[in-house]
């Protein structure tokens, strides 16, 4: 079992990289990929860069060159569910673009042309994440995560996303692109992120203050999931 783990920013991958045994670094296309073992599990950890294009480039490189069996997207997210606070966990059941609009041609809001309306997270990975949440006694919500090339900071964009996707639990800038590429490569994926801010008019201040908290919580989730994946033989 080889697990691909993807984070956008240095703060989101640093704690995991420090745990990799016999770490080797590959730099390609503006991305860095760190390979080795965490707790005996083969890992390829990608630092992709921020945004959908960077995430898609990095995920493609990861899948083409390192062939992980599954992919976990880690890092931070802005919470939209009322039950979420800073440090809580969100787990994707599906991911959608909040800034894609080809509805003029009969597609659903957020659906890219010639693609499914949503990219569905692997149910087995979702269940493993839920088991880890239970064992760690963390507060968590699972559901739809939406991505777009904008940091959501203000009432108008927040209202638009909630109006268009009333079931959304969190927003960020990479996971749907990652899910899109995994769909194209037929690779199981799940998004497991920690809340760094509650998406509102002050979210940029909260993000700066609490990113390290989110990084700690999301990294803890990944290492706990790796322990469970150690005994899995296939997906």
Swiss-Prot record:
GO terms of molecular function: adenosylhomocysteine nucleosidase activity; methylthioadenosine nucleosidase activity
Catalytic activity: S-adenosyl-L-homocysteine + H2O = S-(5-deoxy-D-ribos-5-yl)-L-homocysteine + adenine; S-methyl-5'-thioadenosine + H2O = 5-(methylsulfanyl)-D-ribose + adenine; 5'-deoxyadenosine + H2O = 5-deoxy-D-ribose + adenine
Pathway(s) the chain acts in: Amino-acid biosynthesis; L-methionine biosynthesis via salvage pathway; S-methyl-5-thio-alpha-D-ribose 1-phosphate from S-methyl-5'-thioadenosine (hydrolase route): step 1/2
Quaternary state and interactors: Homodimer.
Name the UniProt record assigns to this protein: 5'-methylthioadenosine/S-adenosylhomocysteine nucleosidase
Record keywords: Amino-acid biosynthesis, Hydrolase, Methionine biosynthesis
Family membership noted in the UniProt record: Belongs to the PNP/UDP phosphorylase family. MtnN subfamily.
GO cellular component, one term: cytosol
Function recorded in the entry: Catalyzes the irreversible cleavage of the glycosidic bond in both 5'-methylthioadenosine (MTA) and S-adenosylhomocysteine (SAH/AdoHcy) to adenine and the corresponding thioribose, 5'-methylthioribose and S-ribosylhomocysteine, respectively. Also cleaves 5'-deoxyadenosine, a toxic by-product of radical S-adenosylmethionine (SAM) enzymes, into 5-deoxyribose and adenine. Thus, is required for in vivo function of the radical SAM enzymes biotin synthase and lipoic acid synthase, that are inhibited by 5'-deoxyadenosine accumulation.
Gene3D superfamilies referenced in this protein's UniProt entry, alphabetically: Nucleoside phosphorylase domain (3.40.50.1580)
Superkingdom: Bacteria
Top-level enzyme category: hydrolase
Pfam families reported in the protein's UniProt record: PNP_UDP_1 (PF01048)
EC number: 3.2.2.9
Residues forming the catalytic site: 12, 197
Gene Ontology BP term (one): L-methionine salvage from S-adenosylmethionine
InterPro entries for the chain: MTA_SAH_Nsdase (IPR010049), Nucleoside_phosphorylase_d (IPR000845), Nucleoside_phosphorylase_sf (IPR035994)
Lineage of source species: Bacteria, Pseudomonadati, Pseudomonadota, Gammaproteobacteria, Enterobacterales
HAMAP family hit by this protein: Salvage_MtnN
NCBIfam families given in the database record: MTA_SAH-Nsdase, PRK05584.1
Binding of substrate, residues: 78, 152, 173-174
Species: Proteus mirabilis (strain HI4320)
């Amino acid at each position: 079992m080889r697990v691909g783990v993807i984070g956008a920013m240095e703060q989101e991958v640093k704690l995991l990289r420090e745990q990799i045994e016999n770490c080797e670094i590959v730099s390609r296309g503006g991305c860095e990929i760190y390979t080795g073992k965490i707790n005996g599990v083969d890992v390829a950890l990608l630092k992709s860069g921020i945004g959908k294009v960077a995430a898609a480039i990095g995920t493609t490189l990861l899948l083409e060159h390192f062939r992980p069996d599954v992919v976990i997207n880690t890092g931070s997210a802005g919470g939209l569910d009322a039950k979420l606070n800073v440090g809580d966990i969100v787990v994707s059941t599906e991911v959608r673009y909040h800034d894609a609009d080809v509805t003029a041609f009969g597609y659903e809001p957020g659906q890219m042309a010639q693609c499914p309306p949503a990219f569905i997270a692997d149910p087995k990975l979702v269940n493993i994440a839920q088991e880890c949440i239970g064992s760690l006694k963390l507060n968590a919500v699972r559901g739809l995560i939406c991505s777009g090339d904008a940091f959501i900071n203000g009432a108008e964009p927040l209202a638009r996303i909630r109006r268009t996707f009333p079931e959304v639990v969190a927003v960020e800038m990479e996971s749907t692109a990652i899910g899109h590429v995994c769909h194209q490569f037929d690779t199981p994926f799940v998004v497991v992120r920690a809340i760094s801010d509650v998406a509102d008019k002050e979210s940029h201040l909260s993000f700066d203050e609490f990113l390290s908290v989110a990084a700690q919580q999301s990294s803890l989730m990944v290492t706990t999931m790796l322990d469970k994946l150690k005994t899995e033989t296939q997906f």
